[in-house]
A protein has these predicted regions:
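Catalytic strand-loop segment that frames the active site of acyl-thioester-processing enzymes
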Residues: 1-39, 56, 127-128
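Intrinsically disordered, low-complexity segments enriched in polar/charged residues with Gly/Pro
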Residues: 8, 23, 58-64, 79-80, ...
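Predominant activation on well-ordered alpha-helical scaffold segments within soluble catalytic domains
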Residues: 10-13, 45-49
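Hydrophobic beta-strand-centered segment that forms part of the acyl-chain substrate-binding groove
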Residues: 32-39, 46-87
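HotDog/MaoC-like acyl-thioester-processing domains
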Residues: 77-128
Length: 128
């Protein structure tokens, strides 16, 4: 599990120029629809890169690249202070252009919540 703190959200806001109050203004957000600030959906999605190597082991490669994503959904917001983790399922593996393409469905779970924060099919390519 990893905690999403306000400094991470603020850093993402700076990096992406998305300073919407639901993300960066704890005082205003306290009376908003979520009762606190929330992580950007794309911040949650970006953390898939942290979770993926924890979920699948890829050996004997010289390089791995992100090829894309399919079916990205954000069913539930991640409130600042919440803890999240990734769960993965390999959907497919196929040979492509001298390497392998692997599709993994990642579900970003929120501790003590029924609905996930994000569900995405990540597409990675690995080369020997």
């Amino acid at each position: 599990w990893m905690e999403i703190d306000q400094s991470r959200v603020d850093g993402f806001a700076e990096a992406t120029d998305d300073h919407q109050w639901i993300h960066v203004d704890p005082e205003k957000a306290a009376s908003g629809p979520f009762g606190t600030t929330i992580a950007h959906g794309y911040l949650t999605l970006s953390l898939v890169n942290k979770f993926l190597p924890q979920l699948i082991a890829v050996t004997e490669i010289s390089m791995g690249v992100n090829y894309g994503c399919d079916r990205v959904r954000f069913p539930s917001p991640v409130k600042v202070g919440a803890r999240i983790r990734g769960r993965g399922e390999v959907i497919s593996v196929e040979e492509v252009n001298g390497g392998q393409q692997v599709v993994v469905r990642i579900t970003v779970e929120i501790e003590n919540e029924n609905r996930p924060a994000c569900v995405v099919d990540t597409i990675s390519r690995f080369y020997p």
